[in-house]
Amino acid sequence: MELPLTSCVVRSWRMGDAEALARHGNNDKIWLNLRDAFPHPYTSHDAREFIKSLRHRTPETTFAIAVNGEAAGSVGFVLRQDVERVSAEIGYWLAEPFWGRGIATEALVAITDHAIATHALTRIYALPFAGNAASCRVLEKAGYVLEGRLRRSAIKNGVITDQLQYAFVVPDTV
């Protein structure tokens, strides 16, 4: 998949992205705001294994955010199951040199639209750590609405923290 946007291209991951992924992903500021499944330190081996793991996943739900041809981050969603099959959880990160340019917001809007159109979703939500003001602002600029605070719901780097629940809800057409 490839979605050309103004500030970036959201596209499928490629093996050639591994070095840029390792270079940008190996950053404390990024790791501190992601789930523990994201390794730290982030090595070239981690990057190659991650990209390889995506090859056989269908449907494709995890994408590179490329800026000037270089993988500079990731955006993806997890489709929920059973009675929540009309929902997905979304997540993203962008390399520090690209912060503050609207890139994450543009990528988030594009993938939100893609996920809704491709998977007949009615709701997409995100759970940033409460202290991640920049991510909360990205969500708000992308049309997500704060629904609540999940108190003491996560632990990162040995610290128990709150998460905020943001959601983009497709308007009811009935």
Q: Which functions belong to the PLM regions below?
A:
Residues 1-29, 62-174:
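Acyl-donor (CoA/ACP) binding surface of acyl/acetyltransferases
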Residues 29-52:
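Conserved GNAT-fold acetyl-CoA-binding loop/helix
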Residues 52-64:
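A short helix-loop-beta-strand connector motif used in the catalytic cores of GNAT acetyltransferases and
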